Structures are given as structure tokens and as C-alpha cells.
Amino acid sequence: MQLEIQVALNFIISYLYNKLPRRRVNIFGEELERLLKKKYEGHWYPEKPYKGSGFRCIHIGEKVDPVIEQASKESGLDIDDVRGNLPQDLSVWIDPFEVSYQIGEKGPVKVLYVDDNNENGCELDKEIKNSFNPEAQVFMPISDPASSVSSSPSPPFGHSAAVSPTFMPRSTQPLTFTTATFAATKFGSTKMKNSGRSNKVARTSPINLGLNVNDLLKQKAISSSMHSLYGLGLGSQQQPQQQQQPAQPPPPPPPPQQQQQQKTSALSPNAKEFIFPNMQGQGSSTNGMFPGDSPLNLSPLQYSNAFDVFAAYGGLNEKSFVDGLNFSLNNMQYSNQQFQPVMAN
């Protein structure tokens, strides 16, 4: 009896694995085994295998067998979840020396287990013998019941005492950790935690990105020079507005030393790096370096009241003057005129 019950149990719970909690499914199998053995006492006839077959049949459909309902209740599973994961209209016959099942009212009857020593066993072909549940990963057909060893948690019954159940029983030993092993796991999980710092990319720098520092300095010098030029254009646009205002008496001139300090402080720190290569002969031309229809609307530069940039910052041979320039100074032509200082507005 125990062998046939185990074959039927393995077939039923194979549909529940990986869909319901495994521990509860194992408890469900143990409770169902206990209830079936209790039900079949006095209704097991090895001399007449088909006697009482309808009583021993387990049916799961619109009406679920009371044994399945009781096992679900004892294991903590919802009966709707159990019925939803099992095939519709499933019937399992557990008879002496044979276990068979049928899915649907008109489905074919397939054999799960048959005793080869029985005289009717030779009539079954290989296709019927191998008609196991394809989803039963834990279901293993038992070929030789006499050679198997009983490992069932319940006591054996009768001549079918040798059985090897395939569902895992409840573990009696609790899972324990030491302080070191628990520290290496994720909190609330037995999986080892991974070091996330090793996977992070190190902070990059301009050297790691393949950029040249000299190129960055040149770009910075050019951008600052254009900023100074834009300030000069705004100053030229504000001149007509200042002319429209009524004339006011000029303030008294400051002392000469204070004038020199104001000119020095008002000079842009990047003015020494800004050079106009096409200034000669373009004092009043509007098609020169800065045409009148340009977005900046820069007027021609006025060279009155100017001072010498080279006198203030040294000659061309000094390194501080030529730093940041991206072209050769030997090919440039300079006029003898003085340069207009860049004044802050």
C-alpha cells in the first residue's frame, strides 16, 4: 500500500512544486500520505486489486476529495491554490500493484506504476510505462520495489513496506549561523552578499579621459578673450545712448597716481592674450575684422588716450605674454599704433 500511495503523492505534488511554497508542499504530502493510509485501512485487497477501486480514487475537480481538503488545511495551503495548480478534473486510482490517472472526463487513462511481477504487467507496452508527468521534476519511477529501501516518516504497512519517497520531509535541524558567517550574508537571507565597491568605476580625471592639459588651457584662454571682446562690443553700443542724454559737467579729474591705478585695475586680466592681427589700415572700415552687420555690432576701435600694452606687460619674448596662444608669433604683423585697453563697463 505504501508504495502505491507514494507514487500517487509524487505525481500530485509535482504540479505544486515551483508554484507554491516548497515547505508547505512537503507538509501537504506528509499529511496526505497519513490520511490516505488511514482511509485505506480495511479497504485494501491484494487478492482482488480492483475491489473498492472507486472508494480509493482521488478526484480533484469542482468537488475536491475531503482528503485533499484536510491535507491542505493541515499544511496551511489554500484549497483554491491547490486546485488551481492541479489539472482540471484529475482522477487518480490507487489500487494494489497499479496506480493510474485520468485528466478530464474523456481523457485517456494512463498508468503511473504497475508491478512487473503481476501477470497483467507484461501486457503493458513501454509507452504506457513511461507516461509520467512531464513537469514532475521530483517524480522518479520505481522499477524494482523489492530493492528499494523504506525512508518514509510513517511506519510501513503490509507487503508494500519498501518505498523511497521523493518529496523532501521537514528538516528537524534548524539553520544556524556563527557571527562570522552571518556577517557575510545579506540581512534576512542566507545568500552571500557581493562587494558592490569592486564593481564601481573609479573617478575619472582629464588624464584618464585622454585629454591634454595644454589644450584645456588654450581653450580657456580663447574663451576668456572672447568674453573680453564681447564686453568691448557692449561698451560701443552704449555710447549712442549716452550721447542722447543731456550733457552733464564732468567730475573733477582724480590725481595722476589714482588714474594709473584705475587703469591698471580696470584692465582685463586676459587682455594681454588678445591680439588683433588685421588692425593696420582699417581704422574707419566697416568691412574689416568686425563688420557692422555682425551679431556684436562692434564699432571701429578708437586709439585715443591709449597706453602701450607691451610697455605695461613687457615684450614679446616674455613667456607670460605668449602662454595660451595657439599660433606662431613669427608670422604675425603688428602696427606701430598703440592698442586700445579693454576697460570694464
From Swiss-Prot:
Sites of Phosphothreonine modification: 204
Q: Which Gene3D superfamilies did the record assign?
A: Anti-proliferative protein, N-terminal domain
Single GO molecular-function term?
SMAD binding
SUPFAM superfamilies, alphabetically?
BTG domain-like
Q: How is it modified after translation?
A: Phosphorylated on Ser and Thr residues.
The effect annotated for residue 55 to A is: Impairs interaction with CNOT7 and CNOT8
Q: Which UniProt keywords apply?
A: Cytoplasm, Nucleus, Phosphoprotein
Bias category Low complexity: which stretches? 144-160, 237-246
**Database matches in SMART domains:** btg1 (SM00099)
Family per record: Belongs to the BTG family.
Designated name of the protein: Protein Tob1
Organism, as annotated: Homo sapiens (Human)
Name of encoding gene: TOB1
